[in-house]
Swiss-Prot record:
<dbReference type="InterPro" id="IPR037231">
    <property type="entry name" value="NAP-like_sf"/>
</dbReference>
<dbReference type="GO" id="GO:0003682">
    <property type="term" value="F:chromatin binding"/>
</dbReference>
<feature type="compositionally biased region" description="Basic and acidic residues">
    <location>
        <begin position="24"/>
        <end position="40"/>
    </location>
</feature>
<dbReference type="GO" id="GO:0006334">
    <property type="term" value="P:nucleosome assembly"/>
</dbReference>
<dbReference type="Pfam" id="PF00956">
    <property type="entry name" value="NAP"/>
</dbReference>
<comment type="similarity">
    <text>Belongs to the nucleosome assembly protein (NAP) family.</text>
</comment>
<protein>
    <recommendedName>
        <fullName>Testis-specific Y-encoded-like protein 4</fullName>
    </recommendedName>
</protein>
<feature type="compositionally biased region" description="Low complexity">
    <location>
        <begin position="101"/>
        <end position="112"/>
    </location>
</feature>
<dbReference type="InterPro" id="IPR002164">
    <property type="entry name" value="NAP_family"/>
</dbReference>
<dbReference type="GO" id="GO:0005634">
    <property type="term" value="C:nucleus"/>
</dbReference>
<feature type="region of interest" description="Disordered">
    <location>
        <begin position="391"/>
        <end position="414"/>
    </location>
</feature>
<dbReference type="GO" id="GO:0000785">
    <property type="term" value="C:chromatin"/>
</dbReference>
<feature type="region of interest" description="Disordered">
    <location>
        <begin position="1"/>
        <end position="129"/>
    </location>
</feature>
<dbReference type="GO" id="GO:0042393">
    <property type="term" value="F:histone binding"/>
</dbReference>
Length: 414
């Protein structure tokens, strides 16, 4: 009996030793399954030899198919032949069972981890019974959905992280593109603004060069004009001398021309007309420079009004640009001074004497007299002389204008 009891205790000790198998050599699952199978067979033989029945002492143990390789621990208990031994075995069984339970849990966890399964810690007897009821395959099949969920969650997190990274990378790329575009635009603006100053300088230089060329051309034109003026002035002078010689033989030619001029006629009174009847010649002479001024010379016969044979009115342009007028004083016979008489024109309006033009340099209308004589009457006096006899003489067309229009000197008193 004692030997049988000792034989019953040996497998427990061996089983406790098998709880922590050596995983270094061979397949731990296969070795574990083989050891458990041999232990179970030895326990059954010993129970049959003792004439007792086997009872399960450890509540957490469960038999499994060797293929599943789950932990299966069974403790033999003696029957009626060894009551004391049975009690002793029952008293000794709880500590051994606790060791076996821990070994079984460690074995199951190790086997499940190697097979790709995840096991939680057994909590109390209910957890141990669940481990007994289910094999390694059952535990694996129950834990697979949790693993898949964890893998799916991990994949989702990885995908979301990748999406976030891609979004950040895309935002960074867009920001870089915007910065590059701004830099390009700023660079283009700088490139446009940098050469602008040289371009403006070049344009200004070109304009200054053109202005200088125009000034040179104008100076050449002035010199050429002076040369032509002098050349054709000499030619005109010959014709003017011949014209003056002919006019002197026509009595009252100039007084008729003055009286027929539409702008000069209102400035001539009856007494002025009588004095102009003694006028035999009119000369208009430009100074050395045509723009410097001109000189008017009235030639008279002896008359009862004044002693002068010629009356001169000269307009001269000073260096300041101001035009001044100079004239010859008129030596009047006693009582013939125009200031002593009231002068009226043909319309009966009171007017100053035309001869005041030689002495008074303040009236603007006297400056107008100089412009009319120089620009209209002197170039072609014949058309004004014939204006009163137009229908009889058969004058055709408008009066002939001079080749060069007269220049206005803005005659002012000096």
């Amino acid at each position: 009996m004692s030997g049988l009891d000792g034989g019953n205790k040996l497998p427990l000790a061996q089983t406790g030793g098998l709880a922590a198998p050596d995983h270094a050599s061979g397949d731990p699952d296969r070795d574990q399954c083989q050891g458990l199978r041999e232990e179970t067979e030895a326990t059954q033989v010993m129970a049959n030899t003792g004439g007792g029945s086997l009872e399960t002492v450890a509540e957490g143990g469960a038999s499994q198919d060797p293929v599943d390789c789950g932990p299966a621990l069974r403790v033999p208990v003696a029957g009626s032949r060894g009551g004391a031994a049975t009690k002793a075995g029952q008293e000794d069984a709880p500590p051994s069972t606790k060791g076996l339970e821990a070994a079984s849990a460690a074995e199951a966890a190790d086997s499940s981890q190697k097979n790709g399964c995840q096991l939680g810690e057994p909590r109390g007897p209910a957890g141990q019974k669940a481990l007994e009821a289910c094999g390694a395959g059952g535990l694996g099949s129950q834990m697979i959905p949790g693993k898949k969920a964890k893998e799916v969650t991990t994949k989702k997190r990885a995908i979301s992280a990748a999406v976030e990274k891609e979004g950040e990378a895309g935002a960074a790329m867009e920001e870089k593109k915007v910065v590059q575009k701004e830099k390009k635009v700023a660079g283009g603006v700088k490139e446009e603004t940098r050469p602008r100053a040289p371009k403006i300088n070049n344009c200004m230089d070109s304009l200054e060069a053109i202005d200088q060329e125009l000034s040179n051309v104008n100076a050449q034109a002035d010199r050429a004009f002076l040369q032509l003026e002098r050349k054709f002035g000499r030619m005109r002078r010959l014709h003017m001398q011949r014209r003056s010689f002919i006019i002197q033989n026509i009595p009252g030619f100039w007084v008729t021309a003055f009286r027929n001029h539409p702008q000069l006629s209102p400035m001539i009174s009856g007494q002025d007309e009588d004095m102009l009847r003694y006028m035999i010649n009119l000369e208009v002479e430009e100074l050395k420079h045509p723009r410097a001024g001109c000189k008017f010379k009235f030639i008279f016969q002896g008359n009862p009004y004044f002693r002068n044979e010629g009356l001169v009115k000269e307009y001269e342009r000073r260096s300041s640009g101001r035009v001044v007028s100079l004239s010859t004083p008129i030596r009047w016979h006693r009582g013939q001074d125009p200031q002593a008489h009231i002068h009226r024109n043909r319309e009966g309006n009171t007017i100053p004497s035309f001869f005041n033009w030689f002495s008074d340099h303040s009236l603007l209308e006297f400056d107008r007299i100089a412009e009319i004589i120089k620009g209209e009457l002197w170039p072609n006096p014949l058309q004004y002389y014939l204006m009163g006899e137009g229908p009889r003489r058969g004058i055709r067309g408008p009066p002939r204008q001079p080749v060069e229009s007269a220049r206005s000197f803005r005659f002012q008193s000096g």
